[in-house]
């Protein structure tokens, strides 16, 4: 796959973020933040994102603009998170990833355990300098820094998320341990051999080329250092010639800003090709978990374990999704929410439905763990 990456205009991106979200946007959280967005900037982000998908909010497969999604993946992903970050925080708090669930384990405990698990496998130690590739709003970085005592640098190409990550780290008293830097993980703004350890949690899926992002991770990791990743990949049961499988995959891609999801073998081959030694490989989605990783997306009230779970899962029932979508549509109609807010919510529902289908068919995992070493020589 050959394509030229776009150049990142850091100042232009920062100015757009301040216009759309406001300079003090980090102090607000969740859907309440949506009421204060600049409506014209929101429309620009919306038109830009859906323009890469033929302006459709559907899981119906459309590959017309796929090459543009590869070349301009940074713009695609940046505007996606301009649009969905508030929705993510509303539904998922500050750690935007899936996890396994132990018996009677709360959502926050399960999320933290998943983060501790990758930190343990990466061998992260106190005082080390660690890179979080695609750090979101900093939830995992905060948790892993507290767990290990490491100094963590979060890399992100979305200014709004960086603003929020800095706010959360300050609020937790971790400003001296955490830094958040604007940058493209396909073109990292760091010299060679900068980090003792590196991890990524469901982030490199946004890359137009896994070989490209892995080569950058390899470049900035110190010789002998470890890289651990939770990767989204298609499993061996996936049949790329099956129309139903194709539709499910496309629903995940359009709903999660993914240029193309790789197969598990392709991702592993990319790690090896850039020079990594794979020292541990583990597919976690069906391992030692009484509940599926998509538990909170499925809307199955029969599996509810607590009243708190009931509130979260009720939102994902058919009637719950309809009520929330209708409310957002009404707020948009009367002008309290920016135009396109319902469209954003609807595309997230497409993603959720597609992820659940993929999980039930066991053709996809969001938690293929690889631990890799960069050779000393």
Swiss-Prot record:
GO terms for cellular component: endoplasmic reticulum; lipid droplet. The lineage of its organism: Eukaryota, Fungi, Dikarya, Ascomycota, Taphrinomycotina. Cholesterol is the major sterol found in P.carinii, of which most, if not all, is scavenged from the host. In addition to cholesterol, 41 other sterols have been detected in P.carinii, but ergosterol, the major sterol in higher fungi, is not among them. Its EC number is 2.1.1.-. It comes from Pneumocystis carinii (strain B80). Optimum temperature is 37 degrees Celsius. It catalyses: lanosterol + S-adenosyl-L-methionine = eburicol + S-adenosyl-L-homocysteine + H(+); eburicol + S-adenosyl-L-methionine = (24Z)-ethylidenelanosterol + S-adenosyl-L-homocysteine + H(+). Pfam families: Methyltransf_11, Sterol_MT_C. Belongs to the class I-like SAM-binding methyltransferase superfamily. Erg6/SMT family. One of its GO terms (molecular function) is identical protein binding. This is Sterol 24-C-methyltransferase.
């Amino acid at each position: 796959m050959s394509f030229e990456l776009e150049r990142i205009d850091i100042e232009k991106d920062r100015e757009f973020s301040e216009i759309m979200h406001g300079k003090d946007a980090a102090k607000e959280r969740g859907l309440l933040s949506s009421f204060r967005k600049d409506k014209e900037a929101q429309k620009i982000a919306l038109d830009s994102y859906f323009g890469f998908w033929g302006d459709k909010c559907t899981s119906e497969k459309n590959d017309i603009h796929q090459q543009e999604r590869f070349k301009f993946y940074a713009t695609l992903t940046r505007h996606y998170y301009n649009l969905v970050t508030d929705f993510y925080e509303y539904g998922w708090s500050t750690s935007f990833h899936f996890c396994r669930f132990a018996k009677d384990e709360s959502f926050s405990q399960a999320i933290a355990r998943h983060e501790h698990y990758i930190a343990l496998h990466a061998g992260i130690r106190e005082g080390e300098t660690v890179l979080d590739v695609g750090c979101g709003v900093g939830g995992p970085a905060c948790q892993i820094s507290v767990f290990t005592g490491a100094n963590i640098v979060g890399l992100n190409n979305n200014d709004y998320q960086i603003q929020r990550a800095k706010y959360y780290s300050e609020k937790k008293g971790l400003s001296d341990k955490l830094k958040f830097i604007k940058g493209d993980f396909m073109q990292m703004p760091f010299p060679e051999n900068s980090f003792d350890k590196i991890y990524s949690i469901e982030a490199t899926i946004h890359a137009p080329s896994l070989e490209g992002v892995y080569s950058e991770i390899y470049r900035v990791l110190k010789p002998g250092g470890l890289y651990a990743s939770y990767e989204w990949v298609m499993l061996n049961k996936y049949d790329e010639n099956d129309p139903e499988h194709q539709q499910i995959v496309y629903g995940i891609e359009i709903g999660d800003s993914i240029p193309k999801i790789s197969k598990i073998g392709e991702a592993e081959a990319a790690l090896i090709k850039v020079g990594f030694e794979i020292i541990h490989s583990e597919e976690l989605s069906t391992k030692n978990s009484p509940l599926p990783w998509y538990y909170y997306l499925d809307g199955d009230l029969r599996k509810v374990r607590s009243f708190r779970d009931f509130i979260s899962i009720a939102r994902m029932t058919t009637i719950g999704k309809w009520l929330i979508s209708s409310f957002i549509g009404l707020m948009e109609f009367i002008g309290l929410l920016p135009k396109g807010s319902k469209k954003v919510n609807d595309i997230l529902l497409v993603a959720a439905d597609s992820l659940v289908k993929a999980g039930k068919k066991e053709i996809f995992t969001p938690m293929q763990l690889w631990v890799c070493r960069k050779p000393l020589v």
